Swiss-Prot record:
The gene is ENDOU. Residues 137-410 form the EndoU domain. The lineage of its organism: Eukaryota, Metazoa, Chordata, Craniata, Vertebrata. This is Uridylate-specific endoribonuclease. It has been suggested that the active SMB domain may be permitted considerable disulfide bond heterogeneity or variability, thus two alternate disulfide patterns based on 3D structures are described with 1 disulfide bond conserved in both. GO terms for cellular component: cytoplasm; extracellular region; extracellular space; plasma membrane. Belongs to the ENDOU family. Pfam families: Somatomedin_B (PF01033), XendoU (PF09412).
Length: 410
């Protein structure tokens, strides 16, 4: 496929030029500087090109980075993560990303800046290698993402999917809620794909959720077994074996069972987006989709989209981005109506296997929680944004996935 425009996020560029400016000292909130090796402007966090000292030098000096209007859940999740009392302990926070709303900090450089919580040394001294989000380099993430890309043998082939992407609009038009595409997005999908074990296990999960937040999720024994079956099937694939091998080598997990248990908690563990206890999870939000305050949130999966469109529940309106890949998986950023509720921009892989998406989102959440994660797929750069759910935790203070989605590409 060919790109019609860039996603509103700019192309992520690795500006590592020798001899260029590499610090934000006296540069906070300046305009983009093409002569600098890294940036200190308000949008560098979204572009993934901030200097290493940006968060420590600049985040106290300006207001929140301006939200990206086409991805409404970004601001929603960012606000949700701050709707709790700022903690004064490092319990469950060792080597988390810097958050200016916290009274004290537990990140890798808090000792350097003298703003650590009092229990930082006692709680975090043994966690630096295994829990620091900076322990896995950008180059390592890009390398493993290429391996995962090559390992996805369950993906759709060119002849398995016929798309009719139709009208490409500008980002300024995404809020208009105008249906510019008279025909469905999917002209044809070879449904034999859905008989593959991971696809079948994935599809079994999609009807286990109530899409409206504020209504508690209550799983039957069969539905809980379906979660285990999905994890069991994807762990048989080369995609997930590549991911586990990488994370095991990075000392993130000591055994495959520990890895699977953590995946189950971070993705399927319930938390509360609305008034009802346990009304949401990372899996429901990202893959199945939710409705909150009259808007579609999450819903970043092509299989779910196809099945709902086939039933007449999804009406495809337009797209603002069509990725550069000439085979599957590809990427599409689209506007649609889901049974009466509008999605301003929903980015999604097209034609990927369930394990492929699950692996990449998990990789980014583990390696870059709450940040932009820069990948490489078939030689093309791609970025994924994750958010942590900070209002509740599991295990020894671990955080659930709030959301994960594609934010940029070339």
């Amino acid at each position: 496929m060919r790109a019609c425009i860039s996603l509103v996020l700019a192309v992520l560029c690795g500006l590592a030029w020798a001899g260029k400016i590499e610090s934000c000292a006296s540069r906070c909130n300046e305009k983009f500087n093409r002569d600098a090796a890294c940036q200190c402007d308000r949008r560098c966090l979204w572009h993934g090109n901030c200097c290493e000292d940006y968060e420590h030098l600049c985040t106290e000096d300006h207001k929140e980075s301006e939200p990206l209007p086409q991805l409404e859940e970004e601001t929603e999740e960012a606000l949700a993560s701050n709707l709790y009392s700022a903690p004064t302990s490092c319990q469950g926070r060792c080597y988390e990303a810097f958050d200016k709303h916290h009274q004290c900090h537990c990140n890798a450089r808090c000792q350097e800046f003298g703003n650590c919580c009092k229990d930082f040394e006692s709680l975090c001294s043994d966690h630096e290698v295994s829990h620091s989000s900076d322990a896995i380099t950008k180059e390592e993430i890009q390398s493993i993402s290429e391996k995962i890309y090559r390992a996805d043998t369950n993906k759709a082939q060119k002849e398995d999917i016929v798309l009719n992407s139709q009208n490409c609009i500008s980002p300024s038009e995404t809020r208009n809620q105008v249906d510019r595409c008279p025909k469905p997005l999917f002209t044809y999908v070879n449904e034999k794909l859905f008989s593959k074990p991971t696809y079948a296990a994935f599809i079994n999960l999609l009807n286990n959720y109530q899409r409206a937040t504020g209504h508690g999720e209550h799983f039957s024994a069969q539905e809980l077994a379906e979660q285990d079956a999905f994890l069991r099937e994807i762990m048989k694939t080369a995609v997930m074996k590549e991911l586990y091998s990488f994370l095991h080598h990075q000392n993130r997990y000591g055994s495959e069972q520990e890895f699977v248990d953590d995946l189950k908690n971070m993705w399927f563990g319930l938390y509360s987006r609305g008034n009802e206890e346990g009304d949401s999870s990372g899996f429901e939000h990202v893959f199945s989709g939710e409705v909150k305050k009259g808007k579609v949130t999450g819903f970043h999966n092509w299989i779910r989209f196809y099945l709902e469109e086939k039933e007449g529940l999804v009406d495809y309106y337009s797209h603002i981005y069509d990725g550069p890949w000439d085979s599957y998986p590809d990427v599409l950023a689209m506007q649609f109506n889901w049974d009466g509720y509008y999605k301003e921009v929903g980015s999604a892989f097209i034609g990927s296997s369930p394990e492929f998406e699950f692996a990449l989102y998990s990789l980014c959440f583990i390696a870059r929680p709450g940040k932009v994660c820069q990948l490489s797929l078939g030689g093309y750069p791609l970025a994924v944004r994750t958010y942590t759910w900070d209002k509740s935790t599991y295990g020894n203070g671990k955080k659930y996935i709030a959301t994960a989605y594609i934010v940029s590409s070339t």
